[in-house]
Amino acid sequence: MPVPKKKTSKARSRRRYAVWLGKAKLQAQRAMTIGRAILSGRNTGFYYPKAKSEEDEEE
């Protein structure tokens, strides 16, 4: 089983953590933007199957 030979430096660890946090923030921002677009009705690139109403079920 491979084992790291040296301890990872604090600078490298913090840099990796900062990159990870940046990616997480970007994903959160995208999710909020998409959510806002859906709620405000500005979404054009999404496909939603229409909910079946009671009239459609009777046919």
UniProtKB/Swiss-Prot annotation:
GO terms for cellular component: large ribosomal subunit. It comes from the Bacteria. GO terms for molecular function: structural constituent of ribosome. InterPro entries: Ribosomal_bL32 (IPR002677). GO terms for biological process: translation. The keyword Zinc does not apply. Keywords: Ribonucleoprotein, Ribosomal protein. Coiled coil: none annotated. Belongs to the bacterial ribosomal protein bL32 family. This is Large ribosomal subunit protein bL32. It comes from Synechococcus sp. (strain JA-2-3B'a(2-13)) (Cyanobacteria bacterium Yellowstone B-Prime).
